[in-house]
Amino acid sequence: MISKKWGSLACLFVVSLLTACSSQEPNDIHQTQSVTTDLSDISVETALTAITNVSDGKGSYKDDHFEMNGTFLNDKLIDGVLILYYTDSTLTFSVKDEKIDFDHVSVSFEDGENYKGQWEDGISGKGTLTFKNGDSYEGDFKNGKMNGSGTYCWKDQACYTGSWKENQMNGNGTYFYDADQTEYLSGTFRDNKPYGKATYFCENHKYTTIWSDGVCTKISYE
């Protein structure tokens, strides 16, 4: 989960007043959480063959580590659902013709987070992560973290869309202050903060801003 503390720039309409940024100085944004899970107990692939004495046809199998529901043949799940149980999470995979669908995986975490998307030896690829507080992220993941391009929306409907690195806003992106997206800041972000030159839009007015370590140091009207 990311929390945002830095507030909106005030809309400034008089050029003579454009000598500084809003008094609502941006603060840091909270750190995100890693969404990795321990797969040391049993691998996804070996779970499909780790059963014995299951009748052919439709049925189910369950032990302490995993559960299968669907059609079985020769002690293998041919079509159905494979569910793996870990100490911190539950993983659900679809199986078709003995093949696991790694593009549509569901992960439910004990802390209330939920992930749906691709799986490559963990949460990697494209997916959607929802947090128990109402925040959500949709985009690229690598090694259980937000990496690549994606959109993070807070429960108050503010959103950031752009580049991510190791669960932080890094690179080019746009931060929308509210749901109607009429007020936003577009530019470069570094470690969850605006950095360098960015363009601020508010009520059809456009401003050029300069940022240093999340603090707006200069603003001018275009």
Q: Predicted regions: what is each one?
A:
Residues 1-19:
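Sec-dependent bacterial lipoprotein signal peptides
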Residues 2, 20-222:
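Glycine/tyrosine- and acidic-biased, solvent-exposed loop/turn segments at the edges of beta-strands
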